[in-house]
């Protein structure tokens, strides 16, 4: 991806908005901006996950012109293809890395306060709650998985569209990536505790 970006930035029609959104989410991280509501979370996702996903889809879809520029000619704008898949994967990612992030720093927890408070949890106590196997952690994770469902469904509808538009190698790479998250998601639907406790190892297993 880094190699591809090096040879496309400045010679492509990739919109500036993805970089602006990415910068905005990074600024929130640096400032330690509190995330109160689910709407705050979705706004943060615009930069934290939708923007990188949009760049990835651009790299998969862009065509190289005779003038040695890259052009995006898909039927819809990038965010149409990226948004639902990105948010769905990001929610799974949050649960997968919950223990690691909670131990490292409360600032790494990008779960809105309203979800934490509804389950009698907080960022500052999340690490100890995980260590003590507080049942509220499972309730929180199940809540997140339920909220991921519409993004999963809509995202896979869009993925079907992408499979009819991308080249063989490009759609193979995309489906392999999404497939890893699909396996983690299905596992979480059956028993989210397994994903919480073994997320990193499970991802490595599913990637092989």
Feature locations, PLM:
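Catalytic cores of Mg2+-dependent Asp-rich isoprenoid enzymes
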Residues: 1-88, 100-208
């Amino acid at each position: 991806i880094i190699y591809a970006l090096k040879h496309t930035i400045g010679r492509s029609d990739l919109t500036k908005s993805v970089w602006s959104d990415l910068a905005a989410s990074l600024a929130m991280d640096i400032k330690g901006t509190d995330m109160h509501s689910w709407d705050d979370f979705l706004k943060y996702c615009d930069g934290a996950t939708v923007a990188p996903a949009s760049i990835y889809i651009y790299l998969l879809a862009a065509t190289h012109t005779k003038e040695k520029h890259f052009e995006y000619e898909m039927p819809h704008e990038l965010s149409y293809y990226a948004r639902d898949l990105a948010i769905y994967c990001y929610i799974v990612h949050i649960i997968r890395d919950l223990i690691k992030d909670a131990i490292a720093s409360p600032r790494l927890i990008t779960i809105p306060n309203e979800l934490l408070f509804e389950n009698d949890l907080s960022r500052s106590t999340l690490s100890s709650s995980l260590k003590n196997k507080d049942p509220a952690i499972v309730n929180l994770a199940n809540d997140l998985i339920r909220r991921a469902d519409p993004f999963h469904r809509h995202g896979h509808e869009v993925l079907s569209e992408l499979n009819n538009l991308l080249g063989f190698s490009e759609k193979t790479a995309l489906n392999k990536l999404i497939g890893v998250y699909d396996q983690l998601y299905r596992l979480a639907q059956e028993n989210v505790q397994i994903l919480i406790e073994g997320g990193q190892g499970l991802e490595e297993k599913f990637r092989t």
